[in-house]
Regions:
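N-terminal catalytic or cofactor-binding beta/alpha core of small enzyme domains
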Residues: 1-161, 165-313
Length: 314
């Protein structure tokens, strides 16, 4: 029987150890394949096969009931937890049980984009059939680039260029200090990670996703959010709905399809793949003042739930 616990507590205990001095190592192709094989088996409902494949790379699968939310989840996590530079930093995956997998919430920059991990939990709780893909390291771990915009947050940027630092980095940014990094642990701009591999599998299945980011209030003055469909437009109707829901809850959105918004994420690696495959993808940036206030963060989560509930078939 799944034990009762708190999803938010599990996530925040995990991310509380992140820092720019933390470790990250890109997985080998074999490691990535084994981990993805386990997660894919879990998506298909084969828990024992999932556990077997995950054990090949010292990952574990636990199930639990989220006390506050009441839903059951599976947690895919590193069983060989390490601290500091020795950490692999491959992240975690949380899968809602009791319903087919239908959509995802993606958190590529936990801690670096402050409270996006907390928002991710609230979003996952908001509708059945969800998957949360959570990065396992600070975006500047393992020697990633700096470039803070004032409160330690960089945003995802709008750049479409090729990044320096290797063929697995994309969306190099526009050169602005908030243009998004392409460091080894910047999951939004790399395609050789566990984070990208899991999202790529969901994207190939045609399942929609929303990726969460944060910006300093001074980066987009007057806006509490930037709503975008990234490099594609398959989620145009969803984006319009999300923007309207945010506005109705007092979070003023910049709509990237009708305005020249910074932080629109057109260089985002997962968004680019979604555009190639015609899968719905939403890129949401929230101002620090929205994320830092529990009430406003809750309103943002409820706005997102208006979209994810539709994805879940509710």
């Amino acid at each position: 029987m799944a034990q009762a616990t708190d999803l938010l507590d599990r996530v925040t205990r995990f991310t509380s150890g992140f820092g720019v001095r933390g470790g990250y190592r890109a997985p080998t192709e074999a490691e990535r394949s084994a981990l993805l094989g386990g997660v894919t088996a879990l998506f298909d409902g084969d828990v024992e096969k999932a556990r077997t494949r995950l054990a090949e790379v010292d990952y574990r699968l636990d199930t639990f009931t989220d006390g506050p939310g009441g839903r059951r989840y599976a947690e895919v996590a590193d069983a060989a937890a390490r601290s500091g530079p020795a950490d692999r930093g491959w992240g975690r995956v949380y899968v809602g049980l009791g319903a087919p997998v239908r959509w995802s919430v993606q958190v590529p920059h936990p801690i670096a984009d402050q409270d996006t991990e907390r928002l991710g939990v609230a979003v996952l709780r908001g509708a059945p059939g969800g998957v949360m893909v959570l990065a396992g390291a600070h975006r500047r771990a393992a020697g990633g680039p700096g470039g803070s915009d004032g409160d330690g947050e960089e945003g995802d940027g709008t750049g479409d260029g090729n990044a320096a630092g290797g063929g697995n980095a994309v969306g190099g940014g526009s050169g602005d200090k908030d243009g998004g990094g392409t460091g080894e642990a910047d999951m939004a701009h790399r395609t050789d990670s566990v984070f990208h591999a899991v999202i790529a599998e969901l994207t190939r299945r045609g399942l929609p996703g929303i990726q969460l980011h944060g910006f300093a209030d001074s980066t987009v003055p007057g806006a509490g959010a930037v709503v975008s469909t990234g490099a594609g437009d398959a989620a145009a109707a969803d984006a319009a709905r999300l923007a309207a829901e945010l506005a109705s809850r007092g979070v003023r959105p910049c709509r990237a399809w009708s305005a020249n918004c910074r932080m629109s994420g057109r260089g985002n690696a997962q968004g680019r793949l979604a555009a190639e495959l015609g899968t719905r993808f939403l890129h949401l940036e929230l101002a620090r003042s929205v994320r830092a206030d529990p009430g406003r963060r809750g309103e943002a989560a409820r706005a997102i739930a208006a979209v994810t509930a539709g994805w879940a078939g509710e």
